[in-house]
A protein has these predicted regions:
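N-terminal alpha/beta PP-like core and its mobile active-site loop of ThDP/TPP-dependent enzymes
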Residues: 1-278
Length: 280
């Protein structure tokens, strides 16, 4: 659900093996930056370290849940008391609602689960919606418009970031042929003339041939250039072409290739600004 919609999803599991069975799914969510809240059970705090059934507190030789999930979650906490629950929930919500989310895991010991908490606590978790000023990217958007106007055969490589940002309509209005990564499938209707199918070693090669043989401008929108998408980083894909890269995660910019124009920002907002400049 989180992958398809970009909305926060949740799962609840028991302590011990219930938590450890989530490892692969959580790891995938971490890599894909999916907003998933995981709530697990835990033995009561007063028996930590005493060998309680399915204990994973890390005490007394038990499984250390913090060590297990620390590298595959954006935030992990064993909630041992309710007096700081508001701070925990604020931190969790901040990550889940951020432009670069990821899995959050909260472990609730059995005795904490039975405590009473005033429901008004939830009213104190308030976050402003992120905004993107049309003028904040004015110069880069103008440069992108100039490069697109000058190109004879531009191609868009759309990834999962397009789906997350809700850029489907703006991308269609742009009117440029689109190929997608596997995670970006669905960002364009594959029955439309603009759709080139998937780009990568598991595809039919149509998008690869279009880029290598014809494209003079390649525009990456929320798309990685991993081993599979790049045909093992085939240099012919980008050789002699101008490259624009837009991503809402700054760490992804120019991670694999050098772009002529690299933009950190919201993909949908930037495309909408671009459409206004192009008069589309």
């Amino acid at each position: 659900h989180a992958r398809a919609s970009g909305a926060i999803s949740a799962c609840i599991t028991t302590a011990g093996p219930g938590a450890t069975n989530l490892v692969t799914g959580i790891a995938n969510a971490y890599v894909d930056k999916l907003p998933i809240l995981i709530v697990t059970g835990e033995t009561s705090t007063f028996i930590f370290g005493k060998g309680g059934m399915q204990e994973s507190s890390g005490e007394g030789g038990s499984i250390d849940q913090a060590a297990l999930f620390g590298s595959i979650t954006r935030y992990h906490r064993i909630v041992e008391r309710t007096d700081y629950l508001l701070q925990v929930l604020r931190q969790a919500a901040q990550i889940l609602l951020s432009p670069n989310p990821g899995p959050v895991l909260l472990s609730l010991p059995y005795n904490v689960q039975k405590e009473m908490v005033n429901a008004s606590l939830l009213d104190e978790i308030r976050f402003g919606k992120a905004t993107h000023s049309a003028g904040s990217h004015a110069s880069t958007t103008e440069e992108m418009a100039r490069m697109i106007r000058a190109a004879r055969h531009p191609v868009v490589v759309a990834g999962y970031g397009c789906l997350v940002s809700g850029a489907q309509v703006a991308l269609r209005q742009l009117g440029i042929p689109v190929t997608t990564t596997l995670k970006g499938k669905g960002v364009v209707d594959e029955d439309t003339p603009l759709a080139l199918g998937c780009l990568g070693v598991t595809s039919d090669g149509r998008a690869y041939r279009r880029i290598v043989d014809h494209a003079d401008l390649v525009i990456f929108l929320g798309a990685g250039f991993n081993e599979r998408t790049s045909y093992l980083w085939d240099a012919r894909l980008l050789a002699g072409k101008q490259v624009i890269q837009i991503d809402n995660d700054a760490s992804q910019l120019e991670k694999v290739f050098q772009a002529d124009l690299a933009i950190h920002g919201d993909i949908r907002a930037l495309l909408e600004d671009l459409l206004a400049l192009l008069g589309t």
